[in-house]
Amino acid sequence: MMTQPNLNIVPFVSVDHMMKLVLRVGVETFLKELAGYVEEDFRRWQNFDKTPRVASHSKEGVIELMPTSDGTLYGFKYVNGHPKNTRDGLQTVTAFGVLADVGSGYPMLLTEMTILTALRTAATSAVAAKHLAPKNARTMAIIGNSAQSEFQALAFKAILGVDKLRLYDLDPQATAKCIRNLQGAGFNIVACKSVEEAVEGADIITTVTADKANATILTDNMVGAGVHINAVGGDCPGKTELHGDILRRSDIFVEYPPQTRIEGEIQQLPEDYPVNELWEVITGRIAGRKDARQITLFDSVGFATEDFSALRYVRDKLKDTGLYEQLDLLADPDEPRDLYGMLLRHEKLLQSESTKPAA
């Protein structure tokens, strides 16, 4: 980590610095390397403190805290989800995060995580698909072409080799935006007029819609044998994308069951409905894809360990880049037990500066 001579200083990665870091590394390389960190932390799943995120729900959306620790480092993310924000020119999702040293409790990094969350969500989806999707899958349908769609496409290209996209959104302008942004990225892209058209011939179906509703984006008759479904949009109570019959036909894989049963597609199913945990697939404890006709479903809601992985990755990539600010965030008195004395000394400093003659 960047060593700081003053204990009050915490490295801060702004949105501008994050964009520069991503572009310096390269988007696909960033996604591939980040996926490596995500997978590494799933492999040591049992080392982590795990809890469902702490959520404050309203009719407009949700604000959440997502904490975890591996005993050496502690990380958390603040994130919101407000689907109607785009009507007011605002982002649906915004986020920031902190990485801290467990030994001292001191923060080591403060960073924007709106862009970073989009990257880690896509990287996690691709990690899951690497273990669950049909072998040599090359064609992906993306239903919902808003803020997350390009990241999903590029992650699946970088990690699985997906090079054919079939896009659909209720808003044709969103699809046009996605196509425009992915020009020159090496995709064969088809803009589709319906969900049914988009999923035709797809090896992987990604659903990434934003409305906070129990929607039915995919119905049972749209999903054929052998498909992998990457269900990203359902991520809070009352927000789903898939018809329940699809769930009952699929082998379901989740990040953390206590959270996914509240927020994911499986909130539609009984609490004791059997699901598989992704970490067990990644570590080889259980099988992922077993045969060519199996329907696999990654019920993605996003979990704190993935943000922890992203924070670790950014911390490591920042070395020697200068792509951060030194933020005066922590009180650092000369005598740790004399915090009030620090305030008094600063008062004297301000008084002396105010009495200095003008130059």
Curated annotation (Swiss-Prot):
GO terms for molecular function: ornithine cyclodeaminase activity. Belongs to the ornithine cyclodeaminase/mu-crystallin family. Coiled coil: none annotated. The keyword NADP does not apply. It catalyses: L-ornithine = L-proline + NH4(+). The keyword NAD applies. SUPFAM superfamilies: NAD(P)-binding Rossmann-fold domains. It comes from Brucella melitensis biotype 1 (strain ATCC 23456 / CCUG 17765 / NCTC 10094 / 16M). The active site is at D235. NAD(+) binds at T92, R120, A147, Q148, D169, T209, V232, G233, G234, D235, K239, S300. It holds the Pfam family OCD_Mu_crystall. Keywords: Arginine metabolism, Lyase, NAD. Its EC number is 4.3.1.12. GO terms for biological process: arginine metabolic process; L-proline biosynthetic process. Its cofactor is NAD(+). This is Ornithine cyclodeaminase. Catalyzes the conversion of L-ornithine into L-proline with release of ammonia. InterPro entries: NAD(P)-bd_dom_sf, ODC_Mu_crystall, ODC_N. L-ornithine binds at R53, K77, R120, D235, V301. Pathway: Amino-acid biosynthesis; L-proline biosynthesis; L-proline from L-ornithine: step 1/1.
